[in-house]
């Protein structure tokens, strides 16, 4: 078929996301990666120490309570804002777990972070889409780098759950998983079109009755399908003498469209403004052979 026929079809179907593959796929192609502030974590996410978070995809950080998901995210935000002087972050917050002091102590420019409290998945959907639609209305040359954060998906309620609680009903909301899936179906294309990354924190739980000890991410299958990368976090304390100064975070890719799945690394996260240790873990996985790259030397859980 001729390219002119394809062009005519694109005009006819009136789909803003349609394009010839040869011209690039606006919502699918990754134009750049965002440095996380840790070389080893960059390699885990993208296969390169100079990579990091894909600039237009959803990345999920999951773990049990107090594994450092929020602190980990704050460290990525800090590095993103320092690298991009005109950038901004929209932080959708459902846990009431962050404060201005927490941002300031970690060296984050609080004037470039907007905190948006959200209570339900519907509220998150509506407000995030409003921000994206306004961003897409700008001329491309006027769009400054932007990042979305949802902290956390697991704490979001639903409109039905709140209405049932107010009415004194104790019934479980069986629609939540479907609502979450619907939200990410809409957001995935919008984020790709706008070239905006979304970091989602979520909780994990032990699967009852599993043959082997197994962790599962909460919230249904919506995030599992929508996220390009899902990383499970666990931690051990990092001490300076007797003082706990941070955590050693073990990261495992449960899903990845850019690197191998089930790879594991460890990185160091300080509680203060240092955040993620840029060089921690690199020496262990550095290979003397050019054919045996850093990623291939990472241990696998498989």
Label each PLM-derived region with a short phrase.
Residues 26, 64, 75-76, 80-182, ...:
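Conserved inter-motif catalytic segment of the P-loop NTP-binding fold
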Residues 50-51, 137-138, 235-241:
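Active-site phosphate-binding and catalytic loops of NTP-dependent enzymes
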Residues 296-301:
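Hydrophobic alpha-helical segments, chiefly the membrane-spanning helices
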């Amino acid at each position: 078929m001729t390219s002119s026929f394809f062009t005519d079809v694109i005009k006819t179907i009136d789909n803003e996301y349609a394009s010839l593959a040869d011209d690039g796929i606006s919502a699918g192609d990754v134009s750049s990666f965002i440095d996380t502030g840790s070389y080893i974590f960059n390699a885990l996410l993208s296969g390169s120490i100079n990579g990091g978070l894909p600039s237009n995809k959803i990345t999920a950080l999951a773990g049990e309570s107090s594994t450092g998901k929020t602190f980990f995210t704050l460290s990525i935000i800090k590095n993103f804002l320092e690298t991009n002087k005109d950038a901004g972050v929209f932080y959708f917050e459902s846990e009431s777990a962050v404060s201005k002091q927490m941002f300031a102590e970690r060296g984050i420019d609080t004037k470039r972070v907007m905190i948006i409290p959200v209570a339900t998945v519907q509220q998150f959907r509506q407000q995030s889409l409003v921000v994206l639609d306004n961003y897409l209305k700008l001329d491309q040359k006027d769009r400054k780098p932007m990042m979305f954060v949802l902290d956390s998906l697991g704490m979001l309620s639903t409109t039905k759950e709140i209405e049932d609680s107010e009415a004194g009903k104790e019934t479980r909301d069986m629609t939540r998983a479907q609502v979450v899936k619907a939200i990410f179906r809409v957001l995935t294309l919008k984020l790709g079109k706008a070239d905006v990354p979304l970091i989602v924190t979520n909780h994990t739980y032990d699967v009852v009755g599993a043959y082997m000890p197994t962790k599962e991410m909460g919230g249904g299958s919506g995030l599992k399908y929508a996220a390009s990368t899902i990383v499970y976090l666990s931690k051990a304390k990092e001490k300076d003498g007797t003082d706990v100064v941070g955590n050693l975070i073990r990261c495992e890719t449960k899903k990845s469209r850019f690197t191998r799945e089930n790879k594991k690394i460890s990185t160091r996260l300080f509680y203060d403004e240092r955040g993620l240790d840029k060089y921690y873990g690199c020496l262990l996985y550095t290979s003397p052979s050019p054919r045996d790259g850093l990623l291939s030397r990472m241990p696998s859980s498989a």
